[in-house]
Regions:
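Membrane-interfacial, low-structure loops and terminal tails that flank and connect transmembrane helices
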Residues: 158-165
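Alpha-helical transmembrane segments of polytopic membrane proteins
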Residues: 48, 97-100, 141, 232-240, ...
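Periplasmic/ER-lumenal interhelical loops and adjacent helix-loop junctions
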Residues: 1-7, 29, 165-263, 269, ...
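Membrane-embedded helix bundles of polyisoprenyl
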Residues: 53-65, 72-154, 168-188, 193
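Membrane-interface coil-to-helix junctions
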Residues: 1-59, 80-101, 191-196, 203-231, ...
Length: 295
């Protein structure tokens, strides 16, 4: 509007490059739905509900294809828990971040299909869409994809194919990111000229929260305490009592010991990543999180 367009706007101070703002806040195709709304508040409400519903649907699609033996009723319950977990609710004010909740299960499914079926297209498209929708959360999704890839890989017994599969995964991820360069490259250049070059990151070993706060994050009814201009306190881990029961039952079951050990290692690494300051900063793009930590 006025003197602004997708690439540059004179409505921002003395003028500013808009590509970085667009790539971070507005690139999600779901934002086009605003064309059907006259009231911005109603649009934000509908968009929030839609994104949470799509996140639940994506997780259901993942579980249906990854764990074919699970009954549909349990998939619906678990998918609802995913879509309505405390992280989703606490981060609904960061609407642009919710796209990651939609795409992450699809990226995981793409990894599974790459390893088990040698199909690379689904992973390629999922990563490409995520980078285009929100490059910042795509970075975290790509980091998690590395963790999940090695989990799925080591759960298989085909050790002779490990190297080949790793190469295929790496090339697929690289091609997906490179394919998004039409938007990602100017965004990266814009960041390097401004906010991206500032750094107050602290890599001093230490934990952001204690064990008491960590346990609280697994319980219902815990809110993220956040005041404007301050760091958030607490960690949002709760995704339903049913999920906690299922997790306990899984580790007590007769499933493969190797799989349970790998699962425990992944969970432990993710918990440490959310609490250990140096690792937390790595997940945040090698920067200290501003206000909302444990993203």
């Amino acid at each position: 509007t006025g003197g602004g367009n997708l690439f540059y706007s004179f409505n921002a101070g003395m003028g500013n490059n808009m590509i970085g703002l667009y790539a971070y806040y507005l690139a999600s195709p779901l934002n086009l739905l605003i064309l059907f709304f006259n009231d911005i508040q109603i649009f934000v409400l509908v968009l929030t509900i839609l994104k949470l519903a799509l996140a639940a649907s994506a997780s259901a699609f993942f579980m249906r294809n990854r764990f074919s033996s699970i009954d549909n009723i349990w998939i619906i319950v678990l998918a609802t828990c995913y879509g309505m977990m405390s992280y989703s609710i606490s981060q609904k004010c960061n609407l642009m971040w919710l796209d990651a909740l939609i795409m992450l299960p699809l990226i995981c499914l793409g990894i599974y299909r790459l390893i088990m079926q040698n199909k690379k297209t689904f992973l390629f498209i999922s990563v490409l869409v995520m980078v285009v929708c929100n490059w910042y959360m795509a970075y975290m999704c790509c980091l998690f994809s590395v963790v999940y890839f090695f989990f799925e890989l080591f759960c298989t017994d085909e050790k002779k194919k490990y190297i080949v599969t790793i190469v295929k995964y790496g090339l697929t991820m690289l091609l997906a990111v490179m394919s998004s360069m039409v938007l990602f490259l100017p965004t990266a250049m814009n960041l390097l000229q401004g906010k991206g070059i500032e750094s107050t990151t602290d890599y001093t070993p230490g934990f952001h929260i204690g064990i008491k706060t960590l346990i609280k994050g697994l319980l219902p009814g815990i809110r993220m305490q956040k005041a404007f201009g301050t760091e958030s306190q607490g960690i949002m881990l709760f995704c339903g009592t049913f999920v906690l029961i299922c997790a306990a039952a899984y580790f007590l079951s007769k499933r493969s010991l190797k799989e349970k050990i790998l699962s425990a290692l992944v969970l432990s690494f993710l918990v440490v990543s959310a609490t250990f300051i140096p690792l937390e900063n790595v997940w945040n793009g090698f920067r200290k999180a501003n206000s909302y930590y444990c993203r």
